[in-house]
């Protein structure tokens, strides 16, 4: 239904002034001219736009349509420039932040711009004998002076706005009240009397409602809810004319520059949005839509000059470049660790505060980061979507798969800046780097060797004899978890490390590396005493015991010491389990490769 809004008002000296806006069609040329040219109708349309209630419409589409119509009738974009519309918005907000007493005074002057408001206020300050001090709340002499000044200034000027009439304070003095009504009759009687305006009971009487309360009335107030006017302080220093930042008229968001106002208004209701032709998603800014559409088109126009990686948005590229520059502007106040992103610092600080906002619904475990919860959930779902193409082993996280693939490819992307040693895993590099930092070195009290904190814990098990990691198949125990993992490959037959030269496979990467030196002839480990070189570090350590005389392996029976640990023969395995022959056989078979196991089991 195409409808417009007419204005009806009635002036009566014997009763308080009330205003009602009724919905009806423009039926006369006079009404149309009023809508186009009259500044008072613009003020009424502004009020109605601000006080519009969603419940007055049949649905969201009609509500949006009416809001647009009222906004057009108020701001008139067909006749006003962007600068003029912006000035109207700033003027409205400026009048809103003024104290109530000054609002009534200023609006009676009917200013057309913010500069006129400043001029009016400065004139008032000069007329009062207290420069720089704004009018205080309802003192008798100042009230009389202000009213007399209002009357003198308004005589002979054009008509007064509805907003001013409605906001006019009601005073106890009958004489002042009579003078005020006479002024209103002179200024508004001719113009508004011709419009056949009638009094409404829905709006507040002009003597009971302040201008500020009317300007700030929320839409919910017109739907039956009430809100108390804000308390007015005597020294509104926060409302300085020079320092006040512009704010959004819809939601009160502060804006740093006036130019931000127009751009921000697109987010507010009633403004046109930009929709994606592919998925229908809408955006408040055209630039955001263009960047979003690159998801569908695959366009990545922003390319990194360092590594050639391309991105859809400029901000993502700028964030990426921090990787190359090494810039880390965000520093933790607790431990001094720096980060390239503020979000990364925010997540890191939760380690110090102990905040864990993300909880698992299955087991209740909490995490400080959303990514941690996401990966943890896969434990319950047993989801392992990332599979290795070399050995078909599956993983729950892509990062773990990437690190695992380094086992097959031989890639060691994590290199120590101090000594150049490379590692497959980042955690291994972190542990290694602690060796170079003296303040993080931990010395063994038994033998004096230095380790990282985790390395010292594992090393001390050599002296204590603790072996917490036990094999479920043969019950053999180990000091380190990695040693247990490597040992279990004996039972499973898994040999993930394969030589490219001869095809021989191994259970441990270190053994493969040492084996490959047979083909290359490389002997990187050299003895400082005699110059002998070896392919593996263990061979060098065993050799150096010849020079040092160290014999760490001692016989439990006779106490004799040896430089090397004697390998247990198959016969000794059976003899150790002579009380349980079958257990000895099973243990012996478990040490064989799977092909041999199947052959021997057939004969048993």
Swiss-Prot record:
<feature type="zinc finger region" description="C2H2-type 8">
    <location>
        <begin position="469"/>
        <end position="491"/>
    </location>
</feature>
<dbReference type="GO" id="GO:0008270">
    <property type="term" value="F:zinc ion binding"/>
</dbReference>
<dbReference type="GO" id="GO:0000981">
    <property type="term" value="F:DNA-binding transcription factor activity, RNA polymerase II-specific"/>
</dbReference>
<feature type="cross-link" description="Glycyl lysine isopeptide (Lys-Gly) (interchain with G-Cter in SUMO2)">
    <location>
        <position position="20"/>
    </location>
</feature>
<dbReference type="InterPro" id="IPR003309">
    <property type="entry name" value="SCAN_dom"/>
</dbReference>
<keyword id="KW-0539">Nucleus</keyword>
<comment type="function">
    <text>May be involved in transcriptional regulation.</text>
</comment>
<feature type="region of interest" description="Disordered">
    <location>
        <begin position="154"/>
        <end position="175"/>
    </location>
</feature>
<keyword id="KW-0832">Ubl conjugation</keyword>
<dbReference type="GO" id="GO:0000978">
    <property type="term" value="F:RNA polymerase II cis-regulatory region sequence-specific DNA binding"/>
</dbReference>
<feature type="cross-link" description="Glycyl lysine isopeptide (Lys-Gly) (interchain with G-Cter in SUMO2)">
    <location>
        <position position="196"/>
    </location>
</feature>
<dbReference type="Pfam" id="PF02023">
    <property type="entry name" value="SCAN"/>
</dbReference>
<feature type="zinc finger region" description="C2H2-type 2">
    <location>
        <begin position="302"/>
        <end position="324"/>
    </location>
</feature>
<keyword id="KW-0863">Zinc-finger</keyword>
<protein>
    <recommendedName>
        <fullName>Zinc finger and SCAN domain-containing protein 12</fullName>
    </recommendedName>
</protein>
<keyword id="KW-0238">DNA-binding</keyword>
<dbReference type="GO" id="GO:0005634">
    <property type="term" value="C:nucleus"/>
</dbReference>
<feature type="zinc finger region" description="C2H2-type 1">
    <location>
        <begin position="274"/>
        <end position="296"/>
    </location>
</feature>
<feature type="zinc finger region" description="C2H2-type 3">
    <location>
        <begin position="330"/>
        <end position="352"/>
    </location>
</feature>
<feature type="cross-link" description="Glycyl lysine isopeptide (Lys-Gly) (interchain with G-Cter in SUMO2)">
    <location>
        <position position="25"/>
    </location>
</feature>
<feature type="zinc finger region" description="C2H2-type 9">
    <location>
        <begin position="497"/>
        <end position="519"/>
    </location>
</feature>
<keyword id="KW-1017">Isopeptide bond</keyword>
<feature type="zinc finger region" description="C2H2-type 4">
    <location>
        <begin position="358"/>
        <end position="380"/>
    </location>
</feature>
<feature type="zinc finger region" description="C2H2-type 6">
    <location>
        <begin position="414"/>
        <end position="436"/>
    </location>
</feature>
<dbReference type="InterPro" id="IPR013087">
    <property type="entry name" value="Znf_C2H2_type"/>
</dbReference>
<comment type="similarity">
    <text>Belongs to the krueppel C2H2-type zinc-finger protein family.</text>
</comment>
<feature type="compositionally biased region" description="Basic and acidic residues">
    <location>
        <begin position="213"/>
        <end position="230"/>
    </location>
</feature>
<feature type="zinc finger region" description="C2H2-type 5">
    <location>
        <begin position="386"/>
        <end position="408"/>
    </location>
</feature>
<feature type="region of interest" description="Disordered">
    <location>
        <begin position="201"/>
        <end position="258"/>
    </location>
</feature>
<feature type="zinc finger region" description="C2H2-type 10">
    <location>
        <begin position="525"/>
        <end position="547"/>
    </location>
</feature>
<dbReference type="InterPro" id="IPR038269">
    <property type="entry name" value="SCAN_sf"/>
</dbReference>
<dbReference type="Pfam" id="PF00096">
    <property type="entry name" value="zf-C2H2"/>
</dbReference>
<keyword id="KW-0677">Repeat</keyword>
<keyword id="KW-0479">Metal-binding</keyword>
<feature type="zinc finger region" description="C2H2-type 7">
    <location>
        <begin position="442"/>
        <end position="463"/>
    </location>
</feature>
<keyword id="KW-0805">Transcription regulation</keyword>
<keyword id="KW-0862">Zinc</keyword>
<feature type="zinc finger region" description="C2H2-type 11; degenerate">
    <location>
        <begin position="553"/>
        <end position="578"/>
    </location>
</feature>
<feature type="domain" description="SCAN box">
    <location>
        <begin position="46"/>
        <end position="128"/>
    </location>
</feature>
<keyword id="KW-0804">Transcription</keyword>
<dbReference type="InterPro" id="IPR036236">
    <property type="entry name" value="Znf_C2H2_sf"/>
</dbReference>
């Amino acid at each position: 239904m195409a409808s417009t809004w007419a204005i009806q008002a009635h002036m009566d000296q014997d009763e308080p002034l009330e205003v009602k806006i009724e919905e009806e069609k423009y039926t006369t040329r006079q009404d149309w001219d009023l809508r186009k040219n009259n500044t008072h109708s613009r003020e009424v349309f502004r009020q109605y736009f601000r006080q519009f209630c969603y419940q007055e419409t049949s649905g969201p589409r009609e509500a949006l349509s009416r809001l647009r119509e009222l906004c057009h009738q108020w701001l008139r974009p067909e006749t006003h420039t962007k600068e003029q519309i912006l000035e109207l918005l700033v003027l409205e907000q400026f009048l809103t932040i003024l104290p109530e007493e000054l609002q009534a005074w200023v609006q009676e002057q009917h200013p057309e711009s913010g500069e006129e408001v400043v001029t009016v206020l400065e004139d008032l300050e000069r007329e009062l004998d207290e420069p720089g001090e704004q009018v205080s709340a309802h003192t008798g002499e100042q009230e009389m002076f202000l009213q007399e000044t209002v009357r003198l200034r308004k005589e002979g000027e054009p008509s007064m706005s509805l907003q001013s009439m409605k906001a006019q304070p009601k005073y106890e003095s009958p004489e002042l009240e009579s003078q005020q009504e006479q002024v209103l009759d002179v200024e508004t009687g001719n113009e508004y009397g011709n419009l056949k305006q009638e009094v409404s009971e829905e709006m507040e009487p002009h003597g009971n409602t302040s201008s500020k309360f009317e300007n700030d009335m929320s839409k919910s107030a017109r739907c039956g809810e009430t809100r108390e006017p804000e308390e007015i302080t005597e020294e509104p220093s926060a409302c300085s004319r020079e320092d006040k930042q512009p704010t959004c008229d819809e939601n009160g968001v502060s804006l740093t520059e006036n130019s931000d106002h127009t751009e921000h208004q697109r987010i507010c209701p009633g403004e046109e949005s930009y929709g994606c032709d592919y998925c229908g998603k809408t955006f408040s800014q055209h630039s955001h839509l263009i960047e979003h559409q690159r998801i569908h088109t695959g366009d990545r126009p922003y390319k990194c000059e360092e590594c050639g990686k391309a991105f859809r948005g400029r901000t993502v590229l700028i964030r990426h470049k921090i990787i190359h520059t090494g810039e880390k502007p965000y520093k933790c106040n607790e431990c001094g660790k720096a980060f390239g992103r503020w979000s990364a610092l925010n997540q890191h600080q939760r380690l110090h505060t102990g905040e864990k906002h993300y909880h698992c619904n299955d087991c209740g475990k909490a995490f400080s980061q959303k990514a941690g919860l996401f990966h943890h959930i896969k434990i319950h779902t047993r989801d392992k979507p990332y599979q290795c193409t070399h050995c078909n082993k599956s993983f729950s996280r892509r990062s773990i798969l990437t690190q695992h693939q380094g086992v097959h490819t031989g890639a060691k992307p994590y290199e120590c800046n101090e000594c150049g040693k490379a590692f497959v895993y980042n955690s291994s590099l972190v542990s290694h780097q602690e060796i170079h930092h003296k303040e993080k070195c931990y010395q063994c009290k038994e033998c004096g060797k230095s380790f990282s904190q985790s390395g010292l814990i594992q090393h001390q098990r050599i002296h204590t004899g603790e072996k917490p990691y036990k094999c479920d198949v043969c019950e053999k125990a180990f000091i380190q978890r990695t040693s247990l993992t490597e040992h279990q490959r004996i039972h499973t037959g898994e040999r993930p490390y394969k030589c490219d030269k001869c095809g021989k496979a191994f259970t441990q990467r270190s053994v493969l590396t040492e084996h490959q030196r047979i083909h290359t002839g490389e002997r990187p480990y050299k003895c400082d005493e005699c110059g002998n070189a070896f392919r593996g570090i263990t061979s060098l350590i065993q050799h150096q015991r010849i020079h040092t005389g160290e014999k760490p392996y001692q016989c439990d029976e006779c106490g004799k010491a040896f430089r090397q640990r004697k390998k247990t023969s198959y016969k000794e395995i059976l003899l150790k389990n002579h009380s349980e022959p079958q257990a000895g056989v099973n243990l012996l078979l478990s040490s064989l490769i799977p092909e041999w196991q199947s052959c021997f089991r057939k004969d048993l």
